């Protein structure tokens, strides 16, 4: 197995940084769209281990990447808890009966029953990890982010229902978050048992919170998960809070080994605020791939020059969030080729 990605979490400064791309197995690739067309709905595809493996392999077959990520979705846990999940074109994920009260929370399945409904994810991890020659990243949504969808019923611009519950009924909110955290610990450990070499916690909506509420309603539960996972097995864990650059000083002392960085700050700024010891992952603006070949190469060169100037810390080159569906696959090749060229 190529171990450059895992070596980034070691103490030795690497000669060159590893690279992978968030949502690297996705709609921007025509081969992904061909597989997706075979299934009536998205979750049916996620439940098919062979299909998950096939689409996880697509970017590895196209590009020189140092890691793969299991093909799945962050909302597998809420669905396993008994919530009715549908993916609606033009809207995205929708829960038909959002959590609004203690009664709704009481309807959810137990942790044991919920975990038993997630075997298809572990099968996808096992099938994929046994096929590839690079590390496989497992993942989950943060409890706060999962709760956002479970309470709102779908994505939202303002998340009024979510934030209302946080302020008006914090006890109920914490009850939901704790249950999600307890399930997530087992979920991640099972992914590791199945073959994941690293796990990532995607805190997509943590960035909407004020600092104190981020600490109490989001980071607290990510840290709880990380500590409990590491008590069982010492595996690299990456925290990524989208829009979370204001929280770096809080994250830097937590149990994660890596921190995802979006494009709202430079890597230099992020390193200054996080300090030494943690791997930084990111932080290209996904939209930079709309640019010309020359502009892509210039942006890559600037980041690689900074990474190489830091003699103490390692970095994982990535986008600051998932790749957009309408990105030209050839632009991705330009980016990766430039990363390899300027890192040589």
From Swiss-Prot:
Record-annotated residues binding substrate?
A: 23-27, 73, 149, 204, 321
Where found, per UniProt?
A: Cytoplasm
Report the principal subcellular site: cytoplasm
**Can you supply a Gene Ontology BP term from the record?**
protoporphyrinogen IX biosynthetic process
Entry's Gene Ontology molecular function annotations: uroporphyrinogen decarboxylase activity
Cellular compartments per GO CC: cytosol
Q: Which InterPro entries match?
A: UROD/MetE-like_sf, Uroporphyrinogen_deCO2ase_HemE, Uroporphyrinogen_deCOase
UniProt keyword list: Cytoplasm, Decarboxylase, Lyase, Porphyrin biosynthesis
Q: Where is this site: Transition state stabilizer?
A: 73
The keyword Translocase appears for this protein: no
Tell me its EC number(s), please.
4.1.1.37
> Catalytic activity, per the record?
uroporphyrinogen III + 4 H(+) = coproporphyrinogen III + 4 CO2
Spell out the SUPFAM superfamilies in the cross-references.
UROD/MetE-like
Q: In which pathway does it act?
A: Porphyrin-containing compound metabolism; protoporphyrin-IX biosynthesis; coproporphyrinogen-III from 5-aminolevulinate: step 4/4
Subunit structure as annotated in this protein's UniProt entry:
Homodimer.
Q: What does this protein do?
A: Catalyzes the decarboxylation of four acetate groups of uroporphyrinogen-III to yield coproporphyrinogen-III.
Family, according to the entry, reads as follows: Belongs to the uroporphyrinogen decarboxylase family.
Q: What is this protein called?
A: Uroporphyrinogen decarboxylase
- Its source organism is Francisella tularensis subsp. novicida (strain U112)
